[in-house]
From Swiss-Prot:
Transmembrane segments: 7-27, 39-59, 89-109, 112-132, 145-165, 182-202, 212-232, 244-264
Protein family (similarity comment): Belongs to the UppP family.
Database matches in NCBIfam families: PRK00281.3-3 (NF001396), undec_PP_bacA (TIGR00753)
Record membrane topology: Multi-pass membrane protein
Keyword set, alphabetical order: Antibiotic resistance, Cell inner membrane, Cell membrane, Cell shape, Cell wall biogenesis/degradation, Hydrolase, Membrane, Peptidoglycan synthesis, Transmembrane, Transmembrane helix
Role description: Catalyzes the dephosphorylation of undecaprenyl diphosphate (UPP). Confers resistance to bacitracin.
Name of the protein: Undecaprenyl-diphosphatase
Species assigned in the record: Borrelia hermsii (strain HS1 / DAH)
Chemical reaction(s) catalysed: di-trans,octa-cis-undecaprenyl diphosphate + H2O = di-trans,octa-cis-undecaprenyl phosphate + phosphate + H(+)
Further details from the record: Bacitracin is thought to be involved in the inhibition of peptidoglycan synthesis by sequestering undecaprenyl diphosphate, thereby reducing the pool of lipid carrier available.
GO biological process: cell wall organization; peptidoglycan biosynthetic process; regulation of cell shape; response to antibiotic
């Protein structure tokens, strides 16, 4: 029964924090420290598959459009009206490549992330969200796909650090480069799909070496909860982004850091 409660909490946190700009990795690290458990790799994989499934459902039509354009490109049948979608595909490809290099580098040092460093990263995320809702300088660089992809990919790679919100930092970078909020949201979450599947491939070997702390039922339960909560969270994030209310998350992170620092 204790394990059931744990997977419910972990699934809920993953579903909330993966989509809202508050860092799922940072929150899960806090939970692991305070619950005194190490997440088995298979459970981590299931949680991420659940959340990426949310993105694929939310952007189902958009993904099908991009796949169709890609097929037309391979067959040499693209038209002028397909160029915008091809640019988006190229942008996501560049972002994915840059993110992968930086993410692999950060993964090598993930065991060195202390609680204090995670709290500092929470503060950094809070500042970025505050700046996103402020009158920050906008650079009109979105037409330069290579430069934009490299910069956004770099930010998304940094987002692999626990406490740094991947969605928050990529949306911040995209808006800074001149993309609209809706475009930035789309870029952030469409680029999540190849990154998650790529990271799962890298963890494939570990899957057979990890201990089964949770039962199959408990693992599936956690994934289902992460999926259902994620469906709600992604819609909530869209609304709050459109309404310019991301400062709520900025305040939340400062409160969280204060509570953890002074109480623990």
């Amino acid at each position: 029964m204790e394990n059931v409660l744990r997977v419910v909490i972990l699934g809920f946190i993953q579903g909330i924090a993966e989509f809202l700009p508050i860092s799922s990795s940072g929150h899960l690290l806090l939970l692991k420290k305070f619950m005194h458990i190490d997440l088995p790799i298979v459970f981590d994989i299931y949680l991420h598959l659940a959340t990426v499934l949310v993105v694929m459902i939310y952007y189902c039509r958009r993904i099908l459009e991009l796949v169709a354009v890609l097929v037309k490109f391979v067959l040499g049948k693209t038209t002028e009206c397909d160029f915008a979608k091809l640019r988006l595909i190229l942008l996501i490809l560049i972002i994915t490549i840059i993110t992968a290099f930086i993410g692999i580098f950060i993964e090598m040092f993930k065991g060195l992330f202390t609680l204090n460093l995670v709290l500092i990263n929470f503060i950094v995320t809070s500042i970025l969200l505050f700046l996103l809702e402020s009158r920050i300088v906008i650079f009109d660089l979105k037409r330069n796909i290579l430069l934009a992809g490299c910069l956004i990919g770099t930010m998304q790679g940094i987002g692999a650090m626990p406490g740094i919100s991947r969605s928050g930092i990529t949306i911040f970078a995209s808006v800074l480069l001149g993309f609209s909020r809706s475009e930035s949201f789309e870029i952030s979450f469409l680029s999540l799909i190849p990154i998650v599947f790529g990271s799962l491939l890298l963890k494939y070997k570990e899957l057979f070496e990890s201990d089964m702390l949770f039962s199959i039922f408990e693992i599936n339960l956690g994934a289902i909860i992460a999926f259902l909560v994620g469906l709600f969270s992604i819609s909530l994030f869209v609304k709050m982004l459109q309404d310019s209310k991301l400062y709520y998350f900025s305040v939340y992170l400062i409160i969280l850091v204060s509570l953890v620092y002074f109480l623990f």
